[in-house]
A protein has these predicted regions:
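C-terminal regulatory/interaction regions
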Residues: 112-174
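Residue-level signal for the nucleotide or nucleotide-sugar donor/cofactor binding architecture
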Residues: 5, 61, 139
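Metallo-beta-lactamase
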Residues: 21-107
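Conserved acidic
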Residues: 2, 6, 95, 136
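Short beta-strand element of the conserved SAM-dependent methyltransferase core
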Residues: 18, 32-34, 168-171
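Single conserved hydrophobic/aromatic residue that forms the stacking wall/gate
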Residues: 1-18
Length: 174
């Protein structure tokens, strides 16, 4: 049957046996997804949500791990995702690819900001999230920090002074 049959089955049984766990660090360092292999269904928790990308907030969240975990999910054969937040995801591979592309676009926005002379995360957030309500800027800053940490790991950006949200960043010479 399709995923609606799975939903009805879970509602009627109220419990199920899951034998396959998938370690997906990134959103948090210990995040796990759980699979029902026979149904090709994956319970994605907060790693892949149905309505938005997950926040990745250092130090427990790590963007490099998050992206690696998304790539891992692309290698799986799941036909439906059941996230903790949002509707079920009927086209998981397309959804995951869109999340990866979104994170790559955010990294490019950071590089664009630095090229325009914006070197601090607090100043990048309004430029990058101009369509986001201001009360969400602190969460957005945590996400920018995670992307910045990933750019530093990849040696595309260097820390000039300070650290974290208070740091000043520039493009790497290499």
């Amino acid at each position: 049957g399709d995923h609606r049959d799975l939903h009805l089955s879970i509602r009627r049984q109220r419990q199920m046996c899951i034998r396959d766990s998938v370690y997906t660090p990134g959103h948090t360092s210990n995040h796990m997804c759980f699979a029902l292999q026979e149904q090709k269904a994956l319970f994605t928790g907060d790693h892949v949500m149905g309505w938005s990308t997950s926040i990745v907030s250092p130090p427990d969240g790590d963007m490099s791990d998050y992206l690696d975990s998304l790539e891992l999910l692309l290698q799986r054969d799941d036909q439906v995702y059941w996230p903790t937040h949002g509707p079920c995801i009927d086209e998981p591979k397309a959804h995951v690819r869109a999340f990866i592309q979104h994170r790559q676009e955010r990294e490019q926005q950071i590089i664009d900001c630095i090229e325009q002379g914006i070197f601090k995360i607090g100043e990048m957030v309004p430029a990058m999230y101009h369509d986001t309500p201001e009360f969400m800027y602190p969460a957005a800053a945590r996400s920018v920090l995670a992307a910045m940490d990933n750019l530093v790991k990849k040696n595309r950006v260097i820390v000039v002074s300070g650290s974290g949200l208070e740091g000043e960043y520039q493009l790497s010479a290499s």
